[in-house]
Structures are given as structure tokens and as C-alpha cells.
């Protein structure tokens, strides 16, 4: 061996171990027993001579620290560049940690071998550990080429488990969020059970905010499931924070911990402005936190930090609460509360949060607390029945059979002003911003402009039963006793569309929210005979009434007339509207074409009350029943009974609806319980 020429370092690392093993085998067969110790010592020295340069070349920091300080940058780059992401020293993902139990067993088996075999195996491991990716591949190819079938079978069984990687731990948080946002609710909950790291990512606000946006107040196009409305203010304020976290603003990274506190903290490592957070939903929770904060020591910064962090609800909790409410709607699980106090039929109502206002034929307006059921105040002033009302944070406006309109400060009970402009009873009113529209039996709709103190009248052929203003598009919807609903342009004071298909008086007309999506569900709907023509879309308008043809816009760009084209900033009217009438039907219309897209059948008598949001339609009528509809499925409906007389009015929110009837009662169906 001494006379053998000295090979290069690379050749030594690849050839000499096999030569050493071969020499060792030959020595066991040919050398005398007395020379065994000398031969073993010679092989060990030769192995050290061959392995040392290899280790010094590819692991300079450990085996050649002085050389590593003066090594060329290109060589250092070549050494590190070949590693995969698991073994890249500069990567945030460290080497895959060996299983402690497996290593213990491996070490025990190694200790059973002779000392020379242990050293040889250790040299092989050291060579492979120090080798770059290319050399490792060559080593593995050589090992596989010399392995028999039992050994290959063992390798196959072992590799099957080893190649399973935690890809979410390997990826940056923003990419992990991108992947998780494609999962459904059930899959996200299962992902949170994989590991603490997965739980921190799967429970993060970035993921669940997307889930809330996709399902709350709308039907998901993928799963067909929709959840009740979330508070708009909280949704808007949190959006900026979620966008920052989704793009890894501030290099946030979820922390992995064993406790729940660590998980919550990992979701709040980025601290945007306070406006981007979600406040507590009740004053009781805030009071409880205030007591806990006051009771704690002011010297402890941890208590202060915990105090502020617990004020924000994770989006997963918001989704969970909305999901519970949605399931209650689906299975008709609700609590019922009855408000008694009126001495005549309840004709109108409105509620916001815990405030409910009702108007009755007993000429009073009552204000209720829906949480306690307590009657807070009774407003008196009208000399005949109150037929319509609407309120906001500061004022209440009522219309009465005494032909007057009154404006109240409902917090104090004071009547601020009174308007007399109709010749007969005021049946409906609606205000939006600075405009008020009132409808009357005198066949007119009067528009009151509080800003410039002006008024004008929209004439109708018969009495008007309902009116709705859309200030964004500057249009008005009206329902008339002549069996038609109309869309008016407030700028030109003209009727731009007539919806004429009811048999009998139209009692209600409302616009569906602009964000509602019905295109996919209406693609195969069967339209009424007035809606479409068998000859195609060009003949749609030919089947409508002469009044519609006379008032339909001729401008080629906008279906609503030239006034919309002249003002580029003007938004078109809502795309869909609903009407109900004494013919027991509810009809869905497309405003741009005047088509009746769908008819809802189910009531046995005339429909007096109608309300809707993006998820459902609520209606009540002379048959004493309340029906809840899905605007996408005309045949599906839930029926609620409880009134002993006709249902005159209804109010709908994300988690409850309230009705008033001729039995003098107001009934609240609450799905939050």
C-alpha cells in the first residue's frame, strides 16, 4: 500500500473506503494472526488520512477552522449551495431532527460490533454527512447498485415515512396562509389538530377573516353555504390589519407553543393601529375586564398587555358564532318573545340592536328594549293610527292616517316638527340622507329635500302603498294599487321603469342589496310570460305594458336613461327588487330590463309585509303565517305560525326577525340562543 501512488482528495473519498474494506478482507484471509493488530492500525491510519481532507474541504468550520477563515467566497458558496432546504445552513428550516428513539436503538446495535467495524461505519457516516448534494447522490447510487432485494425492501419501507415533510413549517407564513385559505371549515379544524405549528397557522386571523368574507352575508359559490351578517364596522376596520398580516407586514411569524396563550399571542404579533381591531361585543365583557384590570397590580406590564389583547376577538370565534346562528336558522331553533302593550293592530315596526319601535292603529308609537322586553317610552301626538315609521340614531319620523308626518327626538319623546302635505292618509315613508319620500292614498309620492327645503310630487294612477329611496343612484321605488311597481329618476322626476305583472294591488316593494349574487342561480330559472319572449331578447320589452314602452330609455349605453350617462359618477339603481301583493305572490325583478325573474308561491292570502337581506326573504300576510325564503330557491321555505290574525309588518336582521299583527302583538324570533 505504501508504494501506491497518492490519489486526489476526491478520488480518496470515493475509492479508498472500498479499497480499505477490501484490504481488510484480504488481510483476514492471508495475513498471519500475529500481524492482525498492525494491519488494523495501518487501515485506521489510512482511513484517517483519506477522510480528513474530505471533511476539511466540505466542513471547514469544524475540521479546518483556520482554513475556513481564508477560504475563497466562491468555494464557500459552492459548498453551501448544493444543500436542499432541509440542510441549507442559511435557511430558517434547520436539519430534520433525528428520532431520538431510533438513534438510541442504532447506537445500541453499533456498540455490539467490534471496535474496528464501529470506526469504519463511523467514517462512512462522517463522509456522507460532510458531502455536498452531488457527492451524496453518487454515494447513494453506489449503495443502491450494490444492495440486494431484502435491503432495497428495507430502504423502501424506511423512506416512505422519512419523505413526509411538514411543508407548512418549511414555507414562509404568508405562503402557508395562502394554502390554508383554500380549505373549507372542516378541513381547517382538522388541520389545527395536526401540531402546535399547524394550529397556530390554521387558527390565524388571516385565514379566518377570508372565511368570514367568503360566507358571511352571502352564499359561497363553492359550498353553497352562507352565514348571517357580521357587523359592518368591525369588518371594515379589521380589513387593513388582515391585509398587512397576509403580506407578512413587519415580518410576523406565528409562534409555536404548547399553551393556548402562546397560540393567541402568535396571532397578535403584529400591532397595527387600534382601529383595526375588533372590540368586545357587550358592555358586560368590557366591565368585567375593567374590574380585572383594576384588581391587578399596576407594576406588572404583563397584566396590562393581557388586558388589551383580550379585548379583541379572533375571527375564528366570529365565524363560529355566526355558524351557530346559521345552523339555528336552518333548523328553526329560536327563542320567541312577545311584546304586548298596543290596544289596536300593529301596522309598522323597525329595530336596530336592542331598540324596537312599533306603530299602531291606537295612534301611538312604542319604544321597546328587546333584551329585557321592557317598554321604554310611548310617543303620543297623532290623532289617528300610525301607519309607517323609520328612525336612526337621532330622530324618528312617523306617518299617520291623520295625513301628517311628524319628526321626533325619540330619546326624549319630544315632537320636533310636523309636516302636512298630503290630502289623505300617509301609508308609507322612507328617508335616506337628506331626502324623505312619503306615499299616500291621495295617489302621490312626495319628495321632501331637507337640505334645500324643496318638495316635488310623483303622480300615480291610484293609491301608493310603499316607497323606497336609493340616494346613491338618486332613484325611488314605489308600489301602487294599480298592480304595478315603478322606478323613478329623482333628477328628471320621471318614471324610467314599470314592473307590471301582479294581479291586484302591489303592497310592498324593496330593493335587494347590491352585493347579492344571483346570476348562477338564475341561469336556468323559468321566467314568467311577461319576463321574456320566445323570440329572443330583442322582444323582451314588447311584452310589457304600453306605459313601460313609453317611459323606457332610448339611450344605447345605460338601461336607465341619458341622465345616468351624463353623470359618470352616478351609480345605477339596485339590480334586483322584490314586490308582493294581494295575489299571494312575491316576485323577483331585474331593474335593468324589467323582467320578472322568479315568482315565489306559498302564501294562501295577500302579502302585507316584506323584508329581505342577502341570505333570505321574510314575508307575512293575511293568512297569519310568516315565511322565510331563500332568494335562490323559490320552492324552499320555512313557515312560522303564532299570530292569531293577519301579519301586517316584519323586520329582518342577521339573527332574528320581528313581526306585528292585527292581534295587537309584536313577536320576536331570536336565533342567537
From Swiss-Prot:
Disulfide bonds: none annotated. WD repeats lie at residues 341-378, 381-420, 422-458, 460-500, 554-599, 602-639, 642-673. Pathway: Protein modification; protein ubiquitination. Keywords: Repeat, Transcription, Transcription regulation, Ubl conjugation pathway, WD repeat. Residues 165-211 form the F-box domain. The keyword DNA-binding does not apply. Component of the SCF(sconB) E3 ubiquitin ligase complex. Residues 1-39 are annotated as: Disordered. Belongs to the WD repeat MET30/SCONB/SCON-2 family. PANTHER family: UBIQUITIN LIGASE SPECIFICITY FACTOR/HREP PROTEIN, UBIQUITIN-BINDING SDF UBIQUITIN LIGASE COMPLEX SUBUNIT. SMART domains: FBOX, WD40. Component of the SCF(sconB) E3 ubiquitin ligase complex involved in the regulation of sulfur metabolite repression, probably by mediating the inactivation or degradation of the metR transcription factor. This is Probable E3 ubiquitin ligase complex SCF subunit sconB. GO terms for biological process: protein ubiquitination. It comes from the Eukaryota. Pfam families: F-box-like, WD40. InterPro entries: F-box-like_dom_sf (IPR036047), F-box_dom (IPR001810), G-protein_beta_WD-40_rep (IPR020472), SCF_subunit_WD-repeat (IPR051075), WD40/YVTN_repeat-like_dom_sf (IPR015943), WD40_repeat_CS (IPR019775), WD40_repeat_dom_sf (IPR036322), WD40_rpt (IPR001680).
Amino acid at each position: 500500500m505504501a508504494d501506491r501512488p497518492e490519489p486526489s482528495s476526491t478520488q480518496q473519498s470515493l475509492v479508498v473506503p472500498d479499497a480499505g474494506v477490501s484490504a481488510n478482507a484480504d488481510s483476514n484471509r492471508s495475513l498471519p494472526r500475529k500481524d492482525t493488530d498492525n494491519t488494523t492500525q495501518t487501515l485506521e491510519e489510512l482511513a484517517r488520512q483519506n477522510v480528513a481532507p474530505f471533511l476539511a474541504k466540505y466542513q471547514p468550520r469544524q475540521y479546518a477552522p483556520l482554513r475556513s477563515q481564508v477560504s475563497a467566497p466562491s468555494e464557500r458558496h459552492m459548498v453551501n449551495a448544493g444543500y436542499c432546504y432541509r440542510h441549507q445552513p442559511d435557511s430558517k428550516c434547520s436539519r430534520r431532527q433525528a428520532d431520538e428513539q431510533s438513534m438510541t436503538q442504532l447506537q445500541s446495535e453499533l456498540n455490539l460490533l467490534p471496535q474496528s467495524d464501529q470506526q469504519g461505519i463511523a467514517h462512512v457516516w462522517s463522509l456522507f454527512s460532510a458531502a455536498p448534494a452531488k457527492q451524496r447522490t453518487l454515494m447513494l447510487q453506489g449503495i443502491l447498485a450494490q444492495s440486494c432485494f431484502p435491503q432495497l425492501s428495507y430502504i423502501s419501507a424506511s423512506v416512505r415515512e422519512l419523505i413526509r415533510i411538514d411543508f407548512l413549517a418549511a414555507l414562509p407564513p404568508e405562503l402557508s396562509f395562502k394554502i390554508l385559505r383554500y380549505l373549507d371549515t372542516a378541513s381547517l379544524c382538522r388541520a389545527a389538530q395536526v401540531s402546535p405549528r399547524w394550529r397556530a397557522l390554521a387558527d390565524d386571523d388571516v385565514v379566518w377573516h377570508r372565511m368570514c368574507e367568503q360566507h358571511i352575508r352571502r352564499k359561497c359559490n363553492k359550498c353553497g353555504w352562507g352565514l348571517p351578517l357580521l357587523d359592518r364596522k368591525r369588518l371594515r376596520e379589521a380589513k387593513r390589519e388582515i391585509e398587512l398580516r397576509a403580506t407578512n407586514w413587519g415580518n410576523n411569524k406565528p409562534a409555536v407553543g404548547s399553551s393556548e396563550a402562546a397560540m393567541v399571542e402568535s396571532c397578535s404579533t403584529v400591532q397595527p393601529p387600534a382601529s383595526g381591531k375588533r372590540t368586545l361585543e357587550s358592555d358586560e365583557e368590557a366591565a368585567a375586564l375593567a374590574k380585572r384590570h383594576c384588581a391587578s397590580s399596576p407594576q406588572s406590564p404583563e397584566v396590562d398587555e393581557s388586558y388589551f389583547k383580550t379585548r379583541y376577538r379572533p375571527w375564528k370565534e366570529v365565524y363560529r358564532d355566526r355558524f351557530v346562528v346559521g345552523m339555528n336558522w336552518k333548523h328553526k331553533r329560536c327563542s320567541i318573545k312577545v311584546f304586548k302593550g298596543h290596544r289596536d293592530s300593529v301596522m309598522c315596526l323597525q329595530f336596530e340592536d336592542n331598540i324596537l319601535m312599533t306603530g299602531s292603529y291606537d295612534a301611538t308609537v312604542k319604544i321597546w328594549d328587546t333584551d329585557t322586553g321592557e317598554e321604554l317610552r310611548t310617543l303620543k301626538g297623532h290623532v289617528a293610527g300610525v301607519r309607517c315609521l323609520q328612525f336612526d340614531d337621532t330622530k324618528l319620523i312617523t306617518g299617520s292616517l291623520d295625513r301628517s308626518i311628524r319628526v321626533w327626538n325619540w330619546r326624549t319623546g319630544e315632537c320636533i316638527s310636523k309636516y302636512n302635505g298630503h290630502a289623505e292618509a300617509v301609508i308609507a315613508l322612507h328617508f335616506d340622507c337628506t331626502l324623505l319620500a312619503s306615499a299616500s292614498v291621495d295617489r302621490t309620492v312626495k319628495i321632501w329635500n331637507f337640505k334645500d327645503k324643496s318638495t316635488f310630487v310623483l303622480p300615480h294612477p291610484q293609491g301608493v302603498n310603499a316607497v323606497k329611496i336609493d340616494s346613491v343612484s338618486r332613484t325611488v321605488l314605489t308600489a301602487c294599487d294599480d298592480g304595478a311597481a315603478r322606478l323613478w329618476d329623482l333628477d328628471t322626476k320621471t318614471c324610467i321603469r314599470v314592473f307590471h305583472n301582479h294581479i291586484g294591488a302591489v303592497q310592498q316593494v324593496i330593493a335587494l342589496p347590491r352585493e347579492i349574487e344571483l346570476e348562477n342561480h338564475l341561469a336556468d330559472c323559468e321566467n314568467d310570460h311577461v319576463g321574456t319572449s320566445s323570440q329572443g331578447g330583442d322582444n323582451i320589452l314588447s311584452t310589457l305594458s304600453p306605459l313601460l314602452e313609453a317611459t323606457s330609455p332610448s339611450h344605447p349605453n345605460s338601461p336607465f336613461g341619458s341622465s345616468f350617462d351624463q353623470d359618470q359618477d352616478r351609480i345605477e339603481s339596485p339590480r334586483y327588487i322584490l314586490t308582493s301583493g294581494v295575489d299571494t305572490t312575491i316576485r323577483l325583478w331585474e331593474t335593468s330590463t324589467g323582467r320578472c325573474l322568479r315568482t315565489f308561491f306559498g302564501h294562501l292570502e295577500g302579502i302585507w309585509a316584506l323584508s329581505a337581506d342577502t341570505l333570505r326573504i321574510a314575508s307575512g300576510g293575511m293568512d297569519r303565517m310568516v315565511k322565510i325564503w331563500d332568494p335562490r330557491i323559490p320552492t324552499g321555505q320555512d313557515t312560522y305560525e303564532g299570530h292569531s290574525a293577519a301579519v301586517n309588518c316584519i323586520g329582518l336582521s342577521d339573527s332574528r326577525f320581528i313581526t306585528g299583527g292585527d292581534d295587537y302583538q309584536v313577536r320576536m324570533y331570536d336565533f342567537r340562543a
